[in-house]
């Protein structure tokens, strides 16, 4: 997003197109042959079932191509963990899929987005990232989708995995993994959205004297 002040934390989400994001980090061209595609341009607070379904199908379509070795998804932080978890269940490939975002607007004095994007591309391009499920690359850490939690609304170190710890980290343009998840994901998941046009709706009823 973009903000009115270089030192403030307020911003308007969904304002920067994918082309501008890539142009802001020319160093990624030294890592991989990166092509940008704009799926949607919304604030992540407006994510919904249909966007998730469209995104999962598009990713599965792209990952079938032999010339694509991995995918990076730029995403707002409000619903990044939900999107990561959904894709972890519905992507049917062992190729790396990495979500990345920023806690500070692109207009901030020390914006975190450019380095986060660089690290995400490094992660997606690394052979070591294969078959590790959907990943989140934020502030130098590599997190598994099933464990990622947003802990703070302004701190750049907000995305963490409090119950299991980070899978690894990026340092000086290289990835280092300390552990892998043993939970089923992606190709092992039983969920398949290939033939769905909409996600099933599940109603939750509330009985009279419930405090829930």
Where are these regions (language model features)?
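Short Gly/Thr/Asp-enriched flexible loops that form oxyanion-binding sites at enzyme active sites
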Residues: 73-95
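Short glycine/serine/threonine-rich phosphate/pyrophosphate-binding segments
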Residues: 3-5, 78-84, 116-117
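Catalytic cores of soluble, metal-dependent hydrolases
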Residues: 65, 211-212
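Internal gly/pro-rich beta-alpha loop/helix module
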Residues: 100-174
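ATP/NTP phosphate-donor binding region
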Residues: 1-64
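Glycine-rich beta-strand-to-loop/alpha-helix junction loops that act as flexible
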Residues: 1, 75-76, 100
């Amino acid at each position: 997003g973009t903000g009115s002040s270089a030192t403030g934390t307020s911003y308007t989400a969904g304002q920067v197109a994918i082309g501008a994001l890539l142009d802001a980090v020319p160093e990624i061209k030294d890592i991989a042959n990166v092509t940008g595609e704009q799926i949607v341009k919304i604030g992540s607070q407006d994510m919904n079932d249909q966007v998730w379904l469209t995104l999962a199908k598009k990713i599965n379509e792209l990952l079938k191509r032999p010339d694509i070795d991995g995918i990076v998804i730029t995403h707002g932080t409000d619903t990044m963990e939900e999107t990561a978890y959904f894709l972890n269940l519905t992507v049917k490939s062992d190729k790396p899929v990495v979500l990345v975002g920023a806690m500070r607007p692109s207009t901030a004095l020390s914006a975190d987005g450019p380095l986060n994007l660089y690290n995400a591309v490094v992660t997606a391009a690394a052979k070591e990232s294969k078959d590790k499920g959907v990943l989140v690359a934020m502030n130098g850490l590599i997190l598994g989708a099933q464990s990622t939690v947003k802990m703070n609304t302004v701190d750049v170190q907000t995305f963490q995995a409090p119950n299991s710890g980070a899978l690894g980290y990026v340092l000086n343009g290289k990835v280092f993994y300390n552990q892998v998840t043993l939970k089923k994901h992606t190709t092992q998941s039983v969920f398949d959205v290939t033939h769905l046009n909409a996600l099933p709706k599940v109603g939750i009823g509330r009985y009279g004297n419930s405090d829930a």
